[in-house]
A protein has these predicted regions:
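Catalytic-loop region of hydrolases
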Residues: 21-88, 92
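Short, surface-exposed "cap/lid" segments of acyl-processing enzymes
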Residues: 70-78, 82-125
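Alpha/beta-hydrolase active-site loop
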Residues: 147-170
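Primarily recognizes the serine-hydrolase "nucleophile elbow" in alpha/beta-hydrolase
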Residues: 162-234
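Short alpha-helix in the alpha/beta-hydrolase fold that links the catalytic acid
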Residues: 194, 328-329, 342-353
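Accessory cap/linker subdomain of secreted extracellular hydrolases
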Residues: 213-323
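C-terminal catalytic histidine-bearing segment of alpha/beta-hydrolase fold enzymes
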Residues: 305, 311-312, 340, 347-348, ...
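Short beta-strand/loop motif that positions the catalytic acidic residue
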Residues: 326, 331-338
Length: 400
């Protein structure tokens, strides 16, 4: 258990794993996707590189697959398939794990660029992990990311899952009929959006268990709470949600209608350049007080600009507008001290699920504080990791 917990602790704090390569299988460094020549031509899914091994003994296959962009147009996206040395051809793996990653900003923080610390959690459990980069990373790095547009991101993850299953079969891998759907923060939101899309569009996609932590399931309510509380734990996420929904949901606001200086003059460099990490961006913003970087008009919920943004956020509200399958099995996790994603998101999701007849919902609400350097949102991810490992091991029948 200590070994697996270490992987999750590293994972959710977003630390990178150093790559070491197998002499027989791999090049001398991470394979790098082609991100400078525009979108790839449409085609079938394919493995982009020879398999390589990371320092924590993960075998990695990067792949490209067909999906859609945030406007619904065809596009090729990228992701990674990872497995421990306990998985091999000819012997069925214990199942698949769809891992939906948390908030990232720097280009090399996505799975296909080598950020695979999270995927180490599958080591020792006999699982094959599938991770989408999301639009705006990997082979679509030259585009803005569709940050926290949950239903769209879920579509890209389901497409990645389907493509990876096909590619794995072609390579001679097999697995038991078990599928875990896991994510924290933005990944928690995406995980619940995967549940929603599966219920509405993919009746044959059976999820064994979903484990979602601290996701923004009700973004309009989150927006209203930030306005009332006047602070947000990670300013970069607030800015990114506004940029993303304004662009991809056609809200039509200028940057000057959304942001104050110095953020206004540094959007391209700080956020869209993909040069910086989340902590670095938050440090450059320099304040948790949203009135220091968001315009008064957007903090006035009666203004035309605020109403337009709220309507866009409402269009992606996961706490309404779909009918969950009663057979879903879900764990929801949150800390009451979280000021990055308010705990009301998880309570509202729990109420929504149970009101629609979903009985197997394990609600995990904990009191986990932050520190002077680490927000409660990140500190709580450690407990989420431990509970996730316990849940997966119990379902698979693996002792601690």
């Amino acid at each position: 258990m200590r070994r697996s917990f270490f992987f999750f602790a590293v994972l959710f704090l977003g630390l990178s794993v150093v790559c070491s390569c197998s002499k027989e299988e791999v090049p001398n460094s991470y394979p790098q996707p082609d991100v400078n020549t525009g979108d790839l031509p449409m085609g079938d899914a394919y493995i982009t590189d020879s398999a390589y091994l990371t320092a924590n003994h993960l075998k990695v296959y990067n792949f490209v697959y067909p999906s859609v962009d945030p406007y619904g147009e065809p596009v090729m996206l990228s992701g990674s398939i990872t497995m421990g040395d306990d998985v091999s051809r000819g012997v069925p793996a214990n199942g698949l794990l769809l891992y939906n990653h948390f908030t990232v900003y720097r280009a090399d923080e996505c799975p296909s660029r080598g950020e695979l610390s999270t995927q180490g959690m599958a080591t020792g459990m006999g699982l094959i992990t599938i991770s989408a980069d999301y639009y705006g990373f990997g082979v679509t790095e030259h585009h803005h990311q569709a940050y926290c547009i949950s239903l769209y991101n879920a579509q890209t993850c389901i497409d990645a899952l389907m493509a990876a299953k096909q590619l794995l079969g072609q390579m001679g891998y097999s697995w038991d009929d078990v599928l875990f759907n896991v994510g924290y923060s933005q990944g928690g939101q995406t995980s619940m959006a995967v549940v929603a899309l599966a219920a509405e569009r993919y009746p044959d996609l059976n999820i064994t268990y979903t484990i979602a932590g601290a996701g923004s399931y009700d973004l309009p309510e989150t927006y209203r709470q930030f306005v009332d509380a006047t602070i947000a734990g990670m300013p970069s996420t607030v800015i990114s949600v506004m940029l993303s929904y304004n662009e991809f949901k056609n809200v039509g606001l200028s940057r000057g209608e959304m942001f104050l200086e110095p953020v206004l003059s540094h959007i391209d460099e700080w956020i869209l350049s993909k040069k910086y990490t989340r902590p670095e961006i938050d440090a450059m913003v320099g304040s948790l007080v949203i009135g220091d970087y968001i315009t008064p008009a957007l903090l006035d919920t009666t203004s035309a600009s605020s109403r337009a943004l709220t309507a866009a956020l409402e269009s992606d509200n996961l706490c309404k507008g779909w009918t969950p399958r009663g057979s879903e099995r879900i764990m929801l996790f949150h800390s009451v001290r979280d000021i990055t994603v308010p705990v009301s998101n998880t309570q509202r999701m729990y109420d929504f699920l149970t009101s629609h007849g979903v009985q197997d919902v394990d609600l995990q609400i904990h009191d986990i504080e932050g520190t002077s350097t680490t927000p409660a949102h990140e500190n709580a991810s450690l407990m989420f990791g431990l509970l996730t490992l316990q849940k997966i091991r119990a379902i698979l029948g693996i002792s601690a």
